[in-house]
A protein has these predicted regions:
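Fe(II)/2-oxoglutarate oxygenase catalytic core
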Residues: 1-63, 69, 74-86, 90-94
Length: 94
């Protein structure tokens, strides 16, 4: 079974993104078996960085899944694509 906790879409633009630094965070804490999936709607030179040093590039139709308590952050895009669109899904999988 699957229990959806939250689904949200994020859209960021490349206007002044070189000034934005996003902090590492977890989506939810203390949720057993909690997972986060990020679906990248479009390709750009941004992505998602993890506190453990891993980096996932924003590439169209890519889905990355990781434990909900793993610290991560948005890496803003600076290329000519005007927007970065992702869909975040937080859920519990038994």
């Amino acid at each position: 079974p699957l229990e959806i906790i939250r689904i949200k879409a994020n859209l960021t633009t490349n206007v002044d993104t070189y000034r934005n630094v996003f902090d590492y965070h977890t989506d939810f804490e203390n949720i057993e078996n909690g997972l986060t999936s990020i679906y990248y709607v479009n390709t750009n030179n941004g992505g998602t960085a993890f506190e453990n040093g891993k980096f996932v590039k924003s590439e169209q139709n890519k889905l990355v899944t990781f434990p909900m308590n793993l610290k991560h952050r948005t890496v803003p895009h600076t290329d000519n694509n005007y927007e970065r669109i992702v869909i975040n899904i937080n859920y519990i999988k038994d």
